[in-house]
């Protein structure tokens, strides 16, 4: 599949200035767990970064995210995603939004298997995914993000957390960029912590 055709099917990718590669953005309004947590004081989702700033300032961004959500139903979505992602060394799933259901997760697993030379990182708040970790491809790191600020999770092989201070993510001290840091993609790092937005 040609890249031009693949981008048309997938509705395009996000290139955030912070990240070392492309990412795929879905509407945070459609997060299954996050939409409930938004109403919970002290939860990470109560101040979701994907529901403010450029994500809401420009209506075209929200419209594009909904087109991407719909694009996942295309019969060639998996192949189209792989056609673009295989050109990337690093890929982040969902700079906004989250896994919608088991079918969505299995499609991501297929894409990872079709792009074995790409390092994939998938942050999620969907706890049910833990039951599917045994079948995940080796080139995919899934980091579970506990719901509350300051909450730690040690039961997953990889997780992340939001903290008020002492974050391990170096991006804030590096002009908001990952630069040469790849903690999030590194399965040997059990927990990555981020400063509260």
Question: Model-derived features: where do they sit?
Answer:
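Class I S-adenosyl-L-methionine
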Residues: 1-197
